[in-house]
Amino acid sequence: MKNIRNFCIIAHIDHGKSTLADRLLEFTNTIQVTNGQMLDDMDLEKERGITIKSHAIQMEYNYKGEKYILNLIDTPGHVDFSYEVSRSIAACEGALLIVDASQGVQAQTISNLYMAIEHDLEIIPIINKCDMASAMPEEVEDEIVELLGCKRDEIIRASGKTGMGVEEILAAVIERIPHPEGDEEAPLQALIFDSVFNSFRGIIAYFKIENGVIRKGDKVKFFNTGKEYDADEVGVLKMELVPRNELRTGDVGYIISGIKTSKEVKVGDTITHVARPCDKAIAGFEEVKPMVFAGVYPIEAEDFEDLRASLEKLQLNDASLTFQPESSLALGFGFRCGFLGLLHMEIVQERLDREFDMNVITTVPNVSYNIYDKQGNMKEVHNPGGMPDPTLIDHIEEPYIKASIITTTDYIGPIMTLCLGKRGELLKQEYISGNRVEIYYNMPLGEIVIDFYDRLKSISKGYASFDYHPNGFRPSKLVKLDIMLNGEPVDALSTLIHFDNAYDMGRRMCEKLKELIPRQQFEIAIQAAIGAKIIARETIKAVRKDVTAKCYGGDVSRKRKLLEKQKKGKKRMKQIGNVEVPQKAFLAVLKLD
């Protein structure tokens, strides 16, 4: 146990943590030299160059004549996936804080760092990408010293590309990170920090043993669900699973016990023995709360059950995805899914498409609102369709967040304009170093859901970074905006929106739909309405045949007769014709800027 070190890697997006992890794995001979990103094994992760899932891997390293076991847990850096980080942090004693030498400290670095400090982890600061021409290691060192209060000589300079500094990092991990504390004689206590689904073996749970020993064939039970299992196989995580006969305190490993449903494995649960259970569960981490909700519908109605199965499988290794069935007049049966943020929503959609071959339509994302009626009862609504009649509502409360934005001084003006446009209120601003500022805002989550992050990146030319935390509910003047086609509301396009923005949004949605809905044989009226009041309208003109073309000269009444006849036909068509809204129109309305 003295020779085990458990550590994770914390960094902002794109500061090079997965590449540096590859170098550590190569240096310890865990893998052969490869073309990169061993731990990002989803195609999607490779393509987008981001880490979505946490990954655990064990390395062996000889240092000063002793053999050490190092368990590395790679974590994502994107704001949507901070729950993945909190789980990984709970399973470690130390963390490598990686900062890009050319970009410096960013919002996500800070928020993940605070999480690590709360769990009392030993922090090893590393400046990565020091081989780049644009690197400014001196200035970045100043920022880190100010942030952590560490000494300058504790900061390691490294490069994931050239492999510089890798030996120093491994030495620091062994010297500075404490070994796991725990009692091998005590009853078994192991924290589950991840689970993956394997179609042959069922669910594989990854855990870290806090106290006690687990052996192959033991009868174990999961503390929170109370279910009992046989440990068919336990082992450690190398590049593949390596079975072992027993795992001791401080080890990180996996257990296979033929579990088939995802509900039974709760990440953050405690594994213990049936014969000698522990008294209490390990204080894990809070349940993940989805922030953004959207309807997900199959394009073909008969794929509904397949979609349910696919979502259940996704939920196995994405604990934060929630879903419940709902139905819509325009789209039929589907699910109301809860996501952590917009990136998460996009990724779930892509994974449905790639891994399960499901084509889905997603509706406008929204957040959950608390609605109070005149009697003072509260109802939580995730879906604009679930809104009670406006006459019964006393007031509506919407969720707020506390956002922290880090940027250079050049972009403060445009960013403040953006935040004010999104109904943000400035809390404070602090200068981190020379020309870097951290700005804090209180903002409604509903304003951020749709396009805030993209716009922040584009007005700051990619230099601003953004992070947020929930900050309670507040009363707000919200109205339900309906979009109607020929007087029929399309429920998938309804949104709850602040009264001040409703007119503008209604007008833009109508204009966008006018471009995207194909012309029919009859004219289509696109209207935006609040209750019974129409606030915007666009008309798609009918496609019509020139019925008078066959008349040569002759009497005007002959032409009029043909035109009247055409008009009657169009009128009849309009009564029975229905308008299909194409999928790309749904997506375009989401991305209105």
Curated annotation (Swiss-Prot):
Disulphide bonds in the chain: none
Catalytic activity line of the entry: GTP + H2O = GDP + phosphate + H(+)
Keyword line: Cell inner membrane, Cell membrane, GTP-binding, Hydrolase, Membrane, Nucleotide-binding, Protein biosynthesis
Root EC class: hydrolase
Alphabetical GO biological process terms: positive regulation of translation
InterPro entries: EF-4, EFG_III/V, EFG_V-like, EFTu-like_2, LepA_C_sf, LepA_CTD, LepA_IV, P-loop_NTPase
Pfam families membership: EFG_C, GTP_EFTU, GTP_EFTU_D2, LepA_C
Domain tr-type G: from-to ranges: 2-181
GO terms of molecular function: GTP binding; GTPase activity; ribosome binding; translation elongation factor activity
GO cellular component terms given for this protein: plasma membrane
Origin: domain of life: Bacteria
Enzyme Commission no: 3.6.5.n1
Binding-site positions, GTP: 14-19, 128-131
Cellular compartments annotated: Cell inner membrane
PROSITE patterns to which the protein is assigned, alphabetical: G_TR_2 (PS51722)
Its membrane topology: Peripheral membrane protein
Name of the protein in its database record: Elongation factor 4
Organism: Bacteroides thetaiotaomicron (strain ATCC 29148 / DSM 2079 / JCM 5827 / CCUG 10774 / NCTC 10582 / VPI-5482 / E50)
Gene name linked to the record: lepA
